[in-house]
C-alpha cells in the first residue's frame, strides 16, 4: 500500500475515536442537528476503519504464511494462504482508495437536464430530440422518473430547447459529466448529394437545489410573466395563461415551466429551475478559477467544452475528454449509456486519487 494511503487511513482510525467521544457528550446529544451530522460522519469513518482493520489482518496473515514457507510440511498450505491474502489485499486496497475519495455533496440529488439546439439549424433540433430520447430511455432503464418542465419544439421535429427534471437515486452523480457540447456528424434526410453535415447541441445537467443552500432571491429582482402553454405543432395544452416564465434581472437568467395546469405549480417549478441555474453559475465561476490552477481530465462542464462526437456513418461515439471511442452508437442512443458513464466515473476517480496523493 502506498504510504500516503496508509497515512490517510491512520488518520481515519484516530478520527473514529474522536467521534466516539463526541457522540457520548450530553451537549452533543441534546443538539439533534449537530448529533445527526456527527453520526453521519461516524458511519462513514466506521466503514473505512472496518475495511482497514480487515486489510491489516490480511497483511498479518500474509506475513505469517511467508514465514511458514521454509517448513516443507507447510509450504503448500502457506503458498495457498499467500495467494489468497494477496488477492484480497489488492481488492481491499482498491475499495479503500474509493472510500477515501472526497464525497460530492450533490451526487445523490435529482437533476435538471437542459438540452439546446446549437449550430446546424433543423438538423441540430432533430439531434436535440435524439439526445432527449437517449436520456429518457436511460432514465427508464434506471427506474428514474422524467418530467418535461418546458419545451420549444422545432417545426421539422426535435427541439430548439427542452428542460427535463429527472427524479431518482444518484441522478446528478450519474449524469453530471454529460454537461457540455455534443457534436453530431450524419447525412440529413434532406441531403441529396449524400454529404455528411456537422451540427451540435449543448447539454447542461444541474442538481436540484438543496433548500439548505438556496440562494436568497429578492422579489424586486424577479420579473414573472405568464403565457399560454403550447405543445408541438402549436396545439394548446389549455386555454389559460398557466405557463410561467421567471427572469432574474441582475443576471438575465431565465427559467420557465409549462408542464402543469396550475399556474402556482408552474411558478414553483420555474423558481426551482432558476435556483438551479443560479447555483450552476456560481459553480461554473468556481470551476473557472480552479481550472486556472489545474486542468481537470473531465473538464469544467461548460457549454463551450466540446465533449463528445456522434458519428453516424461510422457508427461510433467518441468522448474527447477521456479519448474513449465506442462503436455501438445505436445502442448508446437507445439509452444503453452505462459503458460510457462508467468509464467517465472511473476517470474521475483516478483524477481524484491523484489529487489525494498530491495532498
UniProtKB/Swiss-Prot annotation:
Recorded GO molecular functions are: translation release factor activity, codon specific
InterPro entries membership: PCRF, Pep_chain_release_fac_I, Pep_chain_release_fac_I_sf, Prokaryotic/Mito_RF, RF-1
Keywords carried by this UniProt record: Cytoplasm, Methylation, Protein biosynthesis
Show the SUPFAM superfamilies listed in the entry: Release factor
Give the Pfam families listed for this entry.
PCRF, RF-1
- Give the N5-methylglutamine positions (modified residues): 235
GO cellular component entries? cytoplasm
| Family from the record | Belongs to the prokaryotic/mitochondrial release factor family.
- What job does the chain carry out? Peptide chain release factor 1 directs the termination of translation in response to the peptide chain termination codons UAG and UAA.
Q: What is this protein called?
A: Peptide chain release factor 1
Amino acid at each position: 500500500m502506498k504510504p500516503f494511503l496508509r497515512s490517510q487511513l491512520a488518520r481515519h482510525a484516530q478520527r473514529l475515536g474522536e467521534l466516539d467521544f463526541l457522540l457520548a457528550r450530553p451537549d452533543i446529544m441534546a443538539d439533534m442537528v449537530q448529533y445527526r451530522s456527527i453520526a453521519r460522519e461516524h458511519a462513514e469513518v466506521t466503514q473505512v476503519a472496518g475495511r482497514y482493520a480487515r486489510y491489516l489482518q490480511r497483511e498479518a496473515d500474509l506475513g505469517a504464511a511467508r514465514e511458514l514457507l521454509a517448513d516443507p510440511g507447510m509450504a503448500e498450505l502457506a503458498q495457498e494462504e499467500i495467494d489468497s491474502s494477496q488477492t484480497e489485499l489488492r481488492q481491499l486496497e482498491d475499495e479503500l482508495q474509493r472510500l477515501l475519495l472526497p464525497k460530492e455533496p450533490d451526487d445523490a440529488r435529482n437533476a435538471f437536464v437542459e438540452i439546446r439546439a446549437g449550430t446546424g439549424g433543423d438538423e441540430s433540433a432533430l439531434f436535440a430530440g435524439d439526445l432527449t430520447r437517449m436520456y429518457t430511455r436511460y432514465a427508464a432503464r434506471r427506474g428514474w422518473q422524467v418530467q418535461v418542465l418546458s419545451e420549444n419544439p422545432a417545426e421539422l421535429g426535435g427541439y430548439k430547447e427542452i428542460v427535463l427534471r429527472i427524479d431518482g437515486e444518484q441522478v446528478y452523480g450519474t449524469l453530471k459529466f454529460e454537461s457540455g457540447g455534443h457534436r453530431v456528424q450524419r447525412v440529413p434526410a434532406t441531403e441529396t448529394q449524400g454529404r455528411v453535415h456537422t451540427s451540435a447541441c449543448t447539454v447542461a445537467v444541474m442538481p436540484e437545489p438543496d433548500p439548505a443552500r438556496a440562494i436568497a432571491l429578492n422579489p424586486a429582482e424577479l420579473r414573472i410573466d405568464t403565457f399560454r402553454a403550447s405543445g408541438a405543432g402549436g396545439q394548446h395544452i389549455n386555454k389559460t395563461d398557466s405557463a410561467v416564465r421567471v427572469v432574474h434581472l441582475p443576471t438575465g437568467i431565465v427559467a420557465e415551466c409549462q408542464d402543469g395546469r396550475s399556474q402556482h405549480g408552474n411558478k414553483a417549478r420555474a423558481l426551482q429551475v432558476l435556483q438551479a441555474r443560479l447555483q450552476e453559475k456560481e459553480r461554473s465561476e468556481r470551476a473557472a478559477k480552479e481550472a486556472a490552477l489545474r486542468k481537470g481530465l473531465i473538464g469544467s462542464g461548460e457549454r463551450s467544452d466540446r465533449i463528445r462526437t456522434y458519428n453516424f456513418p461510422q457508427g461510433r461515439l467518441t468522448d474527447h475528454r477521456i479519448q474513449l471511442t465506442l462503436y455501438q452508437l445505436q445502442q448508446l442512443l437507445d439509452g444503453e449509456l452505462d459503458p460510457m458513464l462508467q468509464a467517465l466515473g472511473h476517470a474521475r476517480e483516478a483524477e481524484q486519487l491523484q489529487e489525494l496523493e498530491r495532498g
